[in-house]
Amino acid sequence: MTTVPKLTDALLTLENRVATLTLNRHDLRNALTGSNLIDDIVTTAEWVNQCEDVSVLVITGAGSAFSAGGNIRDMTNRSGDFAGDVAECADRYRKGIQRIPLALQNVEVPIIAAVNGPAIGAGFDLANMADIRIASDNAKFGETFLNLGIIPGDGGAWFMQRLIGYQRAFELTLTGRVIDATEAKELGIVLEV
């Protein structure tokens, strides 16, 4: 029997060769910062590559959101991952959230993002790191970094242009426009709604 790692802020299950990672900080709308979700995602990616019983990894969110991305309260208060000067924040970013795309790109099985609600900012980028995205009718997608006066630094700009082309990715990044699941399917961001 395969031992599934115990995670802090996410749930990991394995059934019929399908590993399901559920981001479980619905009180924070599954924000990646201000929680242990970054470590949980990286731990899961490493475990999947060592487990012969996994054929696919599904990532989803608990509650009403897939992931709100960064913790806006911490950003506003310049606390948590966003405390300190620019150099300190940049260092925490590299040692924190930027570990996610590095870990997921090395996963040797297909990754499916089951987007159950809003995927905003780094949450949208997390969905874009998957090989396939399936969205519920409640899903919304937004590359909203510019609305906060920041740029996507967790791989989102690179992943999105691979999915939908440079021009459309540039438009979504520069406008911060939030799109619904239907438009996301029309653009080729999601496979099915």
What are these regions (language model features)?
Residues 1-62, 102:
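Conserved CoA-thioester-binding segment of acyl-CoA-metabolizing enzymes
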Residues 11, 28-31, 65, 74, ...:
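Conserved beta-strand positions that form and line the central face of beta-propeller blades
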Residues 28, 61-103, 119, 149:
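Glycine- (often His-adjacent) and acidic-residue-rich active-site loop
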Residues 31-34, 68, 77, 147, ...:
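Phosphate-coordinating loops and pocket residues in cytosolic domains that bind phosphorylated ligands
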Residues 32-36, 70, 125, 155:
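Generic recognition of short, well-ordered alpha-helical segments
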Residues 102-193:
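Crotonase-fold acyl-CoA enzyme core
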